[in-house]
């Protein structure tokens, strides 16, 4: 069943040549010409990947620092004690603690965007799997959120490091900034994300990996991006 689209979306869709594939810079320029909204939309690069999400050895997951940040204020929670806890606080983490924070999360506290933990804390933090897991907040060594260097992890997240993960349909969607960003900043953030997703290609993936790439804003249609420049990374 066709979804009811807003007048703004339909106006943007009429401007877009859906048969055309743009280089990234032109795709961003096209996106920025769409009718503005009353709020600062998030801009997202979305991928359709040639992998089988049912196969554990074809999982695509990783992190990417955005050269120009995400434009979002990220609230960070850190499970740590001692010097690691002190370092996290000094780096700007909003919530730092151990047993008190674990209990708080068990009671339903979710007012944060990223959770970081020291390796020593993980024995206790794993008990929160059913709470943090469904929201994608469980600390993980592969995304740099399980580390003894809590200060560095907090600083990177605050500066605009984004995480990406393959969904059950074989897609990945990564925010690359805000609609208010300059075109150059959005293009450079987008380029960094595309390169990161390409480098995260599983060794077991066969055939074409980047089946489709689009860039869109919260209330806009997707603009197709040419994946050709990234195929030999």
List the predicted regions and their residue ranges.
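Flexible glycine-/small-residue-rich
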Residues: 47-49, 80, 118-119, 176-178, ...
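Long, charge-patterned amphipathic alpha-helical coiled-coil/hairpin "stalk" segments used as oligomerization
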Residues: 93-198
